[in-house]
Curated annotation (Swiss-Prot):
This is DNA topoisomerase 2. The lineage of its organism: Viruses, Varidnaviria, Bamfordvirae, Nucleocytoviricota, Megaviricetes. Keywords: ATP-binding, DNA-binding, Isomerase, Magnesium, Metal-binding, Nucleotide-binding, Topoisomerase. The record marks 473, 476, 695-696, 745, 780, 786, 954 as: Interaction with DNA. Mg(2+) 1 binds at residues 445, 522. Its EC number is 5.6.2.2. It comes from Acanthamoeba polyphaga mimivirus.
Length: 1263
């Protein structure tokens, strides 16, 4: 027999298979649809604690067993009384009585009773209709705004249907009548109403005995009674009535007292409440430091307990979570915080009054009403957020997040035993064995240093020494996120190679694969930084290891060597620091007679030199130790001062000393440790976030004469940081912050110096070739790529880059599309100096500049002296240790006008940021705050055409931004439709036929799905961006220089955005430009903060005017000397012609010594000419034979007269006059230059112009 025949053994009839029930029957047959499950459920619920002591919580979270359907019919009657309290002003008393023995429940309230009258349309008493007829209600008017709980016409009738007895008693005082009616047998049987006269006050009382059999119960158990009693306390809080339970008044009748029932004042819980900001919203947040409670939402809507929350909770919680997240991100920037991580630490109370609320089901556990239609809006206050922050929850959230993330770091732990293999790792033979702790891992700065170490291993062997190269600098782990640390390949490699376990406290080193780390890095500031980063890594995660002296070591390789002699008499002196070399030079005739070789990188050494270094390993090994005892830092850091150097050439290190200007934002030059353990303090000072101001003071203490003694082989971490690592921080600032006088950072100055020396005004040169020339000539040590980027940046001229580019961009040097990131490779680019540079940097000034020296070579000046402050012409930005700077450029014409005002003792006029070819506007907000506003035109009602963006907003980025807005807007609009549809579906989950049958929706069949869909929809809608949802589409017609975006909005949305003031900010059509971080090195080499453009200009003019005087004095002296030389040359030639000086006698030339003796006898003076070091007669002896003529005499006399006239003209001019003349010459050249630049720009802008838009009705740069 088939399965089919078996299943149809007793087939149902058609009538049995297809049934029709009326609504009354359906409610009893399908309780889940109306009141929820009628079976017992065991779960945690908030209930009243009958056994609570005076200081104990009265409402507790406890596991109970109850029947949801029974709870719901009870709740319907409770909400019915609450609704009456809202409707009727005279309803101010509600009494709830529960007899646990009989199971009888009654709810009484005063106030207006129900109309005791017969309904004319339906011919039935009104109380009978309301409580005994299904789908009857006073809440069907959709045009009326109601803030009650009832709405669907079921309400207390559900309690009637699920009761064995249900009575309604009400008094209509207006008619002087009292109504009483009794229902039994699940509302199937009803007695005739009893109407009597009654002269006292109105009231309504509902009494019922649930049908316990239908709920599988015999009576009201303790759990259910505790749950019902808690609900009465809810009623006391959510209404303004006096509420009684079993004749005892509940005094905890306000929001604060109600929350106190859960979390009394004596508990450890931290409570923050806002019940006054908005009359329709009461909000509380509880932080549980004991971490015993899970995240909870205890919420109410119009006295209904929304146990699953809803959109009202999401609106409140979302704001609070966002506020806390902002605070947390500020405090711990690198910790990844998700909203759920914040919520899990908090309990939220929300009591909201919502107009015409919508719920997902008849059980009304979850509000689905759209937030926009609440009838009110709760906005969390800053005070409230601060109150929550004060509870300490943010620290807990950060700690939890770090604990989670750090747990992931354990996945990258190393092991003390066994092999570890990495591509570039050369393990010690004993590593990972029982003798592993005796091994040393040599961490090298790159592959070249690895080769140096491998050469050295030929000397010391491989048994106890392993080598692993680092790729650049190690990550600063102290403030990095655990995820970033876990993803860092080098951090992971070191952990596995050494055998380090995350968080382990090491009592000894025997469990490690390597018992020490040796750092092999270049002897320069970047090498110091690498050492510090490795120390920081170990100290941050394994502070116990740095307490072992020598766990971290470094190899002191030579920075330079002085060599003298050859063979057996050869002498070699090695130096590991520039300071020790300078000290040696002082004692050894400035190094004369010695050959000096500089080792800027370990790759400079050949294998023999590497082996030589390792042969004397112990003498070159520096071991670091922990020094907790406090030192007198003040006397140590300020023990020496640097003498001023007035010579034209000075050592670079001298320029760095004490460079923080007394007028800067932080002026202290004494750093005092914040931690009693000075080594601990030094570590966090150098690497930890939050100590930026301390680092500024620390940098200010720098003294180049306070350096590590190279003879010491034991150095404390404290001394390393304060004497060696500090030089990296100082150098970092020097590289990042430009000089007031020329607007150059060191790399820019080197490029300009090399370009002038190469004289590339006429002949263009490849950028890659110029990079090599500049690097070699100026001793640049930070890589060709960095220098090439500097050259490219100096030649860029797109909007937002240079206002006046000194180098010409001959090739694709980058555009406004990406902010210059789209430049071609340096090997494809050519450049040359713009002729206008000659009018800015005057040749006469080059001889008075103070040059630096390095490797015993003269390099670029400390700063140049342009005739206008190029820092204001082109602006600058940079970030260094402790200091950053951001200076926006100005119009050169405004700058020149103000210089001339200052030269005549007038006050300069206020300048504002200016960018060449920017067509948008720069507007002053207040003080030092400006904004850059885009230029756009409004076309019709729903379209704007953007023709320029705020400066610094690049075209590609803006296009991506608009693409993202379109995607967001499409999603938001779809979600809103989906939400609207979901709400509509929730309202119509039951469709009633004439016979009363109903059909459930898909979500009704799957309540979990309904709950999930509602939550996801409302969450997304709550985050909607009004600008994104307003945009319909956009198009663009941009090029590398042209901006052209046309944005079309949905009808009416553009006008709304303009009126609300959200258009410009929402579309990023404005960008702030603040003049609040203008740091510069001044003429003394000290960093100074300037508050205004005027302050920069005044400082520049003061110094530049002195330099004009210095130049004048120098030229007068130089020209007088040149006149003297011309005069004595004339006299010499005349003496030769006259025979007073005899060069030839008897057909033979006289000896040079005889001629020089004759010059001395005739009192001819000696002069220093050209590159000569001492005065001599070179100016005479260099005269050629054919210049000993009368024609040459006349020529020299003419030169002498011209020079005399030139000198007289210069003597007659003041420095101010000289400057003004040069400014005028510059303006004349600048006019020509600017005209050509503008013509070229406009030609490119208008060439092959794209499609034209409609004519605008209104053009504006919107405010």
């Amino acid at each position: 027999m088939s399965k089919t025949s078996k299943s149809n053994k007793n087939p149902k009839s058609i009538e049995e298979k297809y049934q029709k029930k009326n609504l009354h029957e359906h409610i009893l047959h399908s309780p889940d649809t109306y009141i929820g499950s009628i079976e017992e459920k065991t779960c945690n619920m908030w209930i009243f604690n009958e056994s609570a002591g005076e200081d104990d919580a009265k409402i507790i979270f406890k596991e109970i067993t109850y029947v949801p359907g029974l709870y719901k019919i009870y709740d319907e009657v409770i909400v019915n009384a609450a609704d009456h309290n809202k409707r009727c002003q005279t309803c101010n008393i509600i009494k709830v009585d529960i007899d646990q023995k009989t199971g009888q429940i009654s709810v009484w309230n005063n106030g207006d009773g129900i109309d005791v009258a017969i309904h004319k349309e339906h011919n039935i008493w009104v109380p009978s209709m309301i409580f005994g007829e299904l789908l009857t209600s006073t809440n069907y008017d959709k045009n009326e705004e109601k803030t009650v709980g009832g709405k669907n016409g079921f309400g207390a009738k559900l309690a009637n249907i699920y009761s064995v007895e249900f009575t309604i008693e009400t008094v209509d005082a207006n008619k002087g009548k009292k109504f009483f009616q009794r229902f039994t047998n699940n509302m199937y049987d009803k007695e005739e109403p009893k109407i009597s006269s009654f002269k006292k006050s109105s009231y309504t009382k509902i009494t019922f005995i649930p049908d316990f059999k239908k709920f599988g119960l015999k009576c009201l158990d303790d759990d259910t009674l505790a749950l019902f009693k808690k609900r009465v306390f809810d009623l006391a809080m959510t209404t303004n009535a006096k509420v009684y339970f079993n004749d005892k008044q509940i005094v905890q009748n306000n929001f604060k007292k109600y929350v106190g029932l859960y979390f009394p004042e004596g508990s450890q819980h931290k409570v923050v409440i806002d019940d006054t900001t908005h009359e329709r919203w009461k909000v509380g947040v509880i932080y549980d430091p004991t971490d015993q409670l899970e995240h909870q939402n205890i919420s109410f809507v119009n006295s209904i307990c929304t146990s699953r929350g809803g959109t009202h909770v999401e609106q409140v919680v979302g704001q609070i979570v966002n506020g806390l997240k902002t605070a947390i991100v500020k405090k711990a920037k690198n910790v990844q915080i998700k909203p759920a991580m914040i919520k899990e630490n908090l309990i939220f109370f929300v009591d909201a009054t919502i107009v015409n609320p919508d719920f997902d089901t008849q059980t009304k556990e979850y509000l689905t009403k759209k937030a926009a239609n609440f009838g009110s809006k709760f906005e969390v206050t800053e005070k409230f957020i601060k109150g929550v922050i004060k509870t300490g929850v943010c620290d807990q959230i950060i700690a939890n997040a770090k604990a989670r993330e750090e747990a992931n770091l354990s996945k990258t732990d190393g092991k003390g035993r066994g092999p570890v293999r990495y591509e570039k790792l050369y393990n010690a033979h004993k590593a990972g064995t029982k003798e592993g702790y005796k091994c040393t891992l040599i961490l090298t700065e790159g592959d070249s240093a690895k080769t140096f170490a491998m050469s050295g291993l030929n000397v010391i062997g491989r048994d106890y020494y392993g080598v692993f190269p680092l790729r650049g600098k190690l990550l600063n782990v102290r403030d990095a996120s655990p995820k970033k640390i876990a993803d860092n390949e080098e951090i992971t490699a070191i952990k596995k190679i050494v055998g380090l376990e995350q968080g382990k406290v090491y009592d000894d080193l025997k469990g490690l694969r390597y018992g020490s780390i040796m750092i092999l890095a270049d002897q320069d500031v970047d090498g110091y930084h690498i050492k510090g980063l490795i120390m920081n890594f170990i100290h941050c995660f394994w502070p116990s290891l740095v307490k072992y002296e020598g766990f971290i070591q470094s190899f002191a390789t030579p920075l330079l060597k002085a060599t003298k002699g050859k063979g057996k008499t050869k002498q070699v002196v090695a130096f590991t620091s520039p300071q020790s070399f300078e000290e040696w030079k002082k004692e050894n005739n400035d190094g004369k007679g010695w050959s000096i070789k500089y080792y800027k990188g370990l790759g400079t050494s050949d294998p023999a030199e590497a082996q030589e270094c390792f042969a004397d390993l112990n003498d070159k090994l520096v071991k670091y130790f922990w020094e907790p005892k406090k030192k007198n830092l003040e006397s140590e850091s300020n023990s020496k001062s640097v003498d001023s150097n007035k010579s034209k050439t000075t050592n670079k290190k001298k320029i760095e000393s004490e460079f923080i200007e007394e007028e800067s934002d932080i002026i202290s030059d004494t750093y005092k440790p914040k931690n009693k353990d000075i080594s601990e303090d030094a570590m966090t000072l150098a690497f930890a976030g939050g100590r930026e101001d301390d680092r500024k003071i620390w940098i200010n203490t720098y003294n180049p004469d306070n350096y590590l003694d190279p003879s010491k082989k034991r150095i404390s971490y404290y001394d390393f940081i304060h004497k060696e690592l500090i030089t990296f921080s100082v150098d970092d600032v020097l590289r990042s912050v430009p000089n007031l006088m020329d607007g150059f950072k060191p790399s820019h100055r080197k490029v300009f110096y090399g370009s002038v020396e190469k004289n590339i005004y006429k002949q263009e040169i490849k950028v890659s070739d110029l990079t090599g020339f500049v690097s070699n000539m100026t001793k640049y040590h930070h890589g060709d790529q960095s220098l090439s980027s500097t050259i490219v940046g100096m030649a860029q001229n797109y909007v937002g880059s240079n206002n006046l580019n000194l180098l010409m961009p001959l090739g694709m040097f980058g555009s406004r599309l990406t902010g210059g990131k789209d430049s071609a490779s340096p090997r494809y680019l050519n450049t040359k100096l713009d002729d206008l540079a000659k009018k800015i940097f005057i040749d006469y000034d080059f001889d008075i500049l103070q040059h630096q020296s390095e490797d015993n070579c003269r390099i670029e000046p400390v700063y140049y002296a342009p005739i206008i402050p190029m820092i204001l012409v082109n602006g600058a930005e940079g970030i260094g240790t402790g200091y950053s700077t951001k200076i926006y450029p100005c119009n050169p014409r405004d700058i020149i006008a103000n210089i001339k005002r200052l030269l005549t003792n007038e006050n300069p006029k206020t300048m504002k940021p200016w960018f060449r070819h920017l067509t948008g506007t720069i507007e002053k907000i207040d003080g030092a705050k400006y904004i850059s506003r885009a230029k756009y035109e409004i076309i019709g009602k729903d379209t704007i055409h953007i023709t320029d963006l705020p400066v610094g907003i690049w075209t590609d980025n803006y296009k991506a931004f608009l693409d993202n807005l379109i995607v967001q807007g499409t999603a938001q609009n779809a979600e809103e439709k989906k939400a609207s549809k979901a709400v509509s579906s929730a309202k119509n989950t039951k469709t009633t036929t004439k016979a009363g049958s109903k059909t459930g929706s898909r979500t009704r069949k799957n309540p979990a799905l309904a709950k999930k869909s509602q939550k996801s929809v409302t969450a997304k809608v709550a985050k909607k961006n009004p600008v994104a949802s307003s945009i319909k589409t956009y198009s663009e017609d941009c090029t590398d220089i042209r901006i052209s975006f046309t944005i079309v909005f949905h009808p009416g949305k553009l006008d709304t955005l303009i009126k609300s003031g959200k258009l410009d900010t929402g579309l990023k059509l404005v960008k702030p430009l603040n003049l609040t971080n203008m740091h510069l090195f001044n003429e003394k080499g000290k960093i100074k903060k300037y508050d205004t453009y005027g302050a920069i200009l005044r400082n520049f003019v003061k110094v530049r005017l002195n330099l004009y005087q210095k130049r004048k004095d120098y030229l007068l002296g130089k020209w007088k000397k040149e006149m003297d030389i011309l005069k004595w040359k004339v006299k010499f030639i005349e003496y030769v012609i006259e025979g007073k000086i005899v060069i030839f006698k008897n057909g033979k030339s006289k000896k040079k010594e005889e001629v020089l003796k004759a010059l001395e006898d005739l009192k001819f003076p000696k002069f220093i000419v050209g590159n000569e070091s001492y005065p001599s007669y070179g100016y005479i002896t260099s005269i050629g034979l054919f210049n000993l003529t009368l024609e040459e005499v006349e020529k020299l006399k003419k030169q002498l007269a011209d020079k005399k006239q030139e000198l007289a003209i210069l003597e007659a001019k003041s420095p101010e006059e000289i400057w003004e003349e040069e400014l005028d010459e510059f303006v004349e050249a600048y006019d020509i230059w600017e005209k050509e630049v503008d013509e070229n720009y406009n030609d490119l802008l208008n060439k092959k112009k794209g499609s034209t838009g409609k004519k605008s009705r209104k053009t504006s740069t919107q405010k």
